């Protein structure tokens, strides 16, 4: 009876007749809500164009009307912003900012403990869950080093709190993992959970005229087939939202996109940091006419977590996370120290209501072919800064000096006009320029299809295929 009432309320909030798959998902969500097992969670998996985001937004709005408390989270700032917009403006947080707190300074970086979950009777909903990793490595400074483990531990530590994970299994899995563990029913059952899972595969009718979604759906269907052909053929005919751009027309076409939809809604997606660097330099020099290494108006992406500047400025956003985007407002005091180049920069954080922050940036990371400064560079910087305070007698005082040193805490950034697909994941742009470059014949077919699908689905209204091979078009 209660399930029927909740199903009806959810359906009414939907605004139009749901598809059969969406109706099943609504019914399952109602079953989940009335389920009394405290160790239960829900997975809502759906590919591009199936109405997954719309359904999640309906759930959030309906839960508000039903008096159910909800917390929205996503892996990146941009994804959290999109989740919030799709949910009627309900606040959304990045997972790291919600579940971790800074514990201690520990040499090269800080250490973060798992936060206490002080919520009660709350449903935690995580969008873009395909990006939630569970391997150690880059996350070593955070909690146990395994994000998914920590997320589950955090949520279920709260009284009567449960979790809903929403995502697309066809997207790229987290770096170093073969699949997305957070969307895998068996994996999540391994936490001792009763799992309510639903899948949305049918592209909703109003989206069927989209070439982006038509080809994304074809790519998803290819993932389950054993075929010898590595490179799939893209259908262009009859679709206004797909366009091939030869290399000699790229500058003009990018210029047109910047004029039509703006720089914030245009991005180049490519396969490597090296190619992203080439595109970023080409765009800055040729399209934007910028000769300085860094100047007002430049778009940047944070490539290493940094808590120092937000703490210093008492910012509400907690810390600057890998993947956060920012616009340069002013650049001052360029200087060389410790074998690296630095500058004081005023940033506008475009994923966080355009909050402004003054930081010191290490300029060397802008052009590095590595994802950020290398471990050797970070270690050398730490040791050089430590040597600056060699005359301070007490070790504890020396460490405090290093902890507050502007050079040691310099923000590591790259230009954000062109990014790798992993960096673009979790965001969408009106216009996406896709450069796949050379694909070696011995490449993993599965990896390539997931990469291509993820890249295709970053585009909202138009996808430009840069220098696309003729043998990949039908």
Predicted segment positions?
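ASCE P-loop NTPase helicase motor core
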Residues: 26-27, 31, 36-228, 232-235
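Short, conserved phosphate/pyrophosphate- and ester-handling motifs at nucleotide-, phospho-/glycolipid
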Residues: 22, 76, 272, 426
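Short, solvent-exposed amphipathic alpha-helical segments in soluble enzyme
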Residues: 88, 283-287, 450-453
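Conserved pre-motif I regulatory segment
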Residues: 2-40
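Catalytic phosphate/metal-binding cores of nucleic-acid and nucleotide-processing enzymes, i.e., regions
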Residues: 39, 77, 333, 414, ...
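C-terminal accessory regions
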Residues: 337-474
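Conserved SAM-binding loop
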Residues: 18, 72, 268
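Conserved helicase motor core of P-loop NTPases
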Residues: 5-6, 25-30, 37, 155-161, ...
């Amino acid at each position: 009876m209660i399930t029927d009432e909740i199903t009806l309320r959810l359906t009414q909030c939907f605004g139009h007749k749901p598809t059969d798959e969406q109706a099943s998902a609504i019914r399952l969500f109602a079953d989940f809500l009335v389920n009394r097992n405290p160790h239960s969670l829900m997975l809502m998996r759906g590919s591009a164009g199936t109405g997954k985001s719309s359904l999640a937004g309906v759930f959030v709005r309906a839960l508000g009307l039903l008096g159910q408390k909800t917390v929205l989270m996503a892996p990146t700032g941009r994804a959290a912003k999109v989740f919030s917009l799709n949910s009627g403006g309900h606040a959304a947080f990045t997972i790291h900012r919600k579940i971790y707190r800074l514990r201690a300074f520990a040499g090269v970086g800080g250490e973060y403990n798992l936060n206490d979950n002080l919520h009660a009777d709350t449903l935690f909903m995580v969008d873009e869950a395909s990006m939630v990793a569970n391997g150690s490595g880059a996350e070593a400074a955070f909690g146990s080093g395994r994000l998914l483990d920590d997320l589950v531990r955090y949520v279920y530590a709260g009284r009567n709190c449960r979790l809903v994970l929403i995502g697309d299994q066809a997207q790229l899995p987290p770096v170093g993992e073969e699949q997305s563990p957070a969307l895998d029913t068996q994996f999540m059952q391994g936490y001792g959970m009763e799992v309510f899972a639903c899948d949305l595969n049918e592209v909703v009718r109003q989206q069927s005229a989209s070439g982006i979604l038509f080809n994304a759906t074809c790519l998803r269907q290819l993932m389950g087939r054993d075929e010898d052909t590595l490179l799939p053929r893209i259908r262009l005919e009859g679709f206004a939202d797909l366009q091939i751009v030869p290399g000699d027309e790229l500058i003009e076409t990018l210029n047109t996109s910047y004029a039509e939809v703006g720089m914030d809604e245009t991005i180049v997606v490519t396969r490597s940091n090296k190619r992203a660097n080439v595109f970023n330099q080409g765009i800055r020099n040729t399209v934007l006419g910028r000769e300085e290494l860094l100047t007002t108006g430049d778009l940047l992406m944070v490539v290493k977590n940094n808590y120092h500047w937000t703490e210093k400025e008492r910012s509400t956003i907690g810390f600057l996370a890998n993947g956060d985007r920012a616009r340069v407002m002013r650049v001052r005091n360029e200087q060389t120290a410790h074998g690296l180049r630095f500058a004081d920069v005023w940033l506008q954080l475009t994923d966080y209501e355009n909050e402004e922050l003054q930081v010191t940036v290490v300029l060397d990371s802008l052009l590095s072919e590595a994802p950020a400064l290398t471990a050797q560079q970070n270690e050398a910087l730490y040791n050089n800064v430590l040597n600056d305070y060699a005359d301070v007698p007490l070790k504890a005082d020396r460490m405090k000096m290093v902890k507050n040193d502007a050079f040691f805490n310099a923000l590591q950034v790259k230009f954000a006009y062109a990014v790798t697909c992993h960096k673009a994941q979790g965001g969408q742009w009106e216009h996406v320029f896709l450069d796949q470059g050379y694909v070696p014949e011995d490449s993993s077919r599965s990896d390539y299809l997931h990469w291509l699908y993820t890249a295709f689905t970053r585009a909202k209204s138009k996808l430009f295929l840069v220098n696309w091979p003729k043998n990949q078009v039908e």
